[in-house]
Amino acid sequence: DRCPTSDITFDGQNRAFSNCRNLATQSARIAWNLNLINESSHGTLEVFFVGTAPSPSGWVGWGINPSGLAMSGTQAFIAFSAPNGSTILTFNVSEDVKSGIAPLRCTPISLDVVSMAVQISGSVISTLVVLQIDPTITTSSVNLVWNRGASVSNFQPAAHGFTADDLASLTAVDLLMSASVPQVTTHSPHSLLKDVSWPY
């Protein structure tokens, strides 16, 4: 379900994105710009994500899993209100976290992050993340995972709910349909962005 790109505002400014999509669950929305310069220069993937937490004290998160279409291995960005203000942190969602053996703690991730920003209005949480893309990569296919939870304690997000809306979402989006692509590129022309909800 495509959405208009003209009504996206972040930090008081209108933002232009090549693509926008309403996700199938949790009233979440994602918009992105994929900028590929040439074969020898790094490109960028700019991602705007907005979701609604179950409560003002809750969290919203999304991430990319470089290893497959699954929750375990997701390199995540989770945002919430903290005592020091609106916060967005990185989390490596390991198999131990998925299994409930280990808590979800802020950790470095494998993605090359250029910048992160967040704005929160009540329970609505918007994030803006810019990632750097390696020019030697042979595919621009990524797996996107998202979810939300009702509370955060000591900067550790609590587990999300287990309703059907929390557990079931799957779609595919062609990142390159409206991307800024050079005339000569090694990137796959049929790359897909796959989305799946975040089941703990």
Predicted features and spans:
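Extracellular-facing/secreted segment signature in eukaryotic proteins
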Residues: 1-199
